[in-house]
From Swiss-Prot:
This is S-methylmethionine--homocysteine S-methyltransferase BHMT2. It is an enzyme of class 2 (transferase). It comes from Pongo abelii. Zn(2+) binds at residues 208, 290-291. PROSITE patterns: HCY. GO terms for molecular function: S-methylmethionine-homocysteine S-methyltransferase activity; zinc ion binding. Its EC number is 2.1.1.10.
């Protein structure tokens, strides 16, 4: 199948999902831009949209070229409680960058908010909703296409976020960073999904904290909860680009490798093709990634689901399906790897003879 850019005119997120179209999200910004020298670990705030706009623009472009058709604003932790006086300029600049790149393809712009830094200590609903509302006002001013509330570990705060975002006329998606065990108050994934849909979310799911396998288990529990309650919503999954079977309820932040030693846990492109197919088979139609999800991972989703989408992304022009380009290699043992069976069954080594395959979480 030849690369074909994108089909037709832009449609809204719900129109796409309701027609059965696969929507491919973007991937890692904080972790990737930290590695590239544009984000400081710790607070993980997105000043880069002002300080280094070219770096953010380039990453958006890489995801677009790889197959993403949602450009999410780089506004993680960009509320006033984290950024003080800079928050408004950062949110506005992030919207402008996302819109600029989205205009180069068949991509929508999603304005994103996340859990606040104050909820754990002061469950002040009015104050927290004010923080969400401030960001929403910028997103409305910049005319984003839809809204995403992501990375919530407490469903109560996620519900507050949805309630605020529903004050606009834009569709609302919400994803929680929880495992199959549920949120930090032991509310099950199924019950979380029910509460979020009742609050007004049209799209629900999970993002970050856990790898693809764990995230898909959580999504299945959300799906079952909605079915039991007789509720309908579109499903969305954006996991880590890392393998994390050994992490606890808090996710990868508990692992001793977080955040500077995660490279040995990176998913291969073939792992991600498997994830994309499994997500699709579960009924998920909004499929993307979060921390550690590089552009080549997004391309893997787009390639795996090209039969359903009807086209390949531009980045596939230089990438043979399942290693087929290796047919041209001069070494016969490398040419022998130009087949799907080889890559699907490979168990990659770390190259570190004294490394364990799993770690013990710190919490």
């Amino acid at each position: 199948m030849a690369p074909a850019g994108h089909p037709g005119a832009k449609r809204g997120i719900l129109e796409r999902l309701e027609s059965g179209e696969v929507v491919i999200g973007d991937g890692s910004f904080l972790i990737t831009l930290e590695k590239r020298g544009y984000v400081k670990a710790g607070l993980w705030t997105p000043e880069a949209v002002i300080e280094h706009p070219d770096a953010v623009r380039q990453l958006h472009m890489e995801f677009l070229r790889a197959g993403s058709n949602v450009m999410q604003t780089f506004t993680f932790s960009a509320s006033e409680d984290n950024m003080e006086s800079k928050w408004e300029d950062v949110n506005a600049a992030a919207c402008d960058l996302a819109r600029e790149v989205a205009g180069k393809g068949d991509a929508l712009v999603a304005g994103g908010i996340c859990q606040t830094s104050i909820y754990k200590y002061h469950k002040d609903e009015a104050r927290i909703k004010k923080l969400f509302r401030q960001q929403l006002e910028v997103f409305a001013w910049k005319n984003v296409d839809f809204l995403i509330a992501e990375y919530f570990e407490h469903v109560e705060e996620a519900v507050w976020a949805v309630e605020v975002l529903k004050e606009s006329d834009r569709p609302v998606a919400v994803t929680m960073c929880i495992s199959p065990e549920g949120d930090m108050h032991d509310i099950t994934p199924g019950e979380c999904a029910v509460r979020l849909v009742k609050a007004g979310a049209s799209i629900v799911g999970v993002n970050c904290r856990f790898g693809p396998e764990t995230s898909l288990k959580t999504i299945e529990l959300m799906k079952e909860g909605l079915q039991r309650a007789g509720l309908k919503a579109h499903l969305m999954v954006q996991p880590l680009g890392f393998h994390t079977p050994d992490c606890g309820k808090e996710g990868f932040v508990d692992l001793p490798e977080y955040p500077f030693g995660l490279e040995s846990r990176a998913a291969t492109r073939w792992d991600i093709q498997k994830y994309a197919r499994e997500a699709y088979n579960q009924g998920v139609r909004y499929i993307g990634g979060c921390c550690g999800f590089e552009p080549y991972h997004i391309r893997a989703i787009a390639e795996e689901l090209a039969p359903e989408r009807g086209f390949l992304p531009p980045a596939s022009e230089k990438h043979g399906s399942w290693g087929s380009a290796l047919d041209m290699h001069t070494k016969p043992w490398v040419r022998a790897r130009a087949r799907r069976e080889y890559w699907e069954n490979l168990l990659p080594a770390s190259g570190r003879p004294f490394c364990p395959s799993l770690s013990k979480p710190d919490v």
